[in-house]
Amino acid sequence: AAEHLHGSGASAVFIARGIYGNPWVFGDARALAFDGTPVPSRSSVERLEALREHLTLTHELLPLMSRARTYASWYLKGMPHAAAWRAQVVRCSTYEEFMALVDDIERDVVVCEAALAAGEPVPAHPLEA
């Protein structure tokens, strides 16, 4: 993206849907475009922390949590067992249910990523074990 911005002479970049599940995208784009700083990849735990904050802010502004299902799906993209967790997300209807589920997801992600780092297979999804 930085090469295209500098090479084309454009003065702006349209980020669009890149923001979904990636609240860092504006800071990352700025750092890359102006400083050439490489964009760091965020860990799954960092993404889940951002999801918690997003859910909390949503709940404070609009206690009806139906939109939160969409937000949660964005943040789960690419995580171990993401499809199984998204199936659980659609069953959540309260803030408390969402937060408890995010805690469960984090525990699972930590175990899965540790297994991958050790060269071991990813354990089965907790609800399938």
What do the PLM-derived regions correspond to, one by one?
Residues 1-129:
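Alpha/beta catalytic cores of nucleotide-metabolism and tRNA/nucleoside-modifying enzymes
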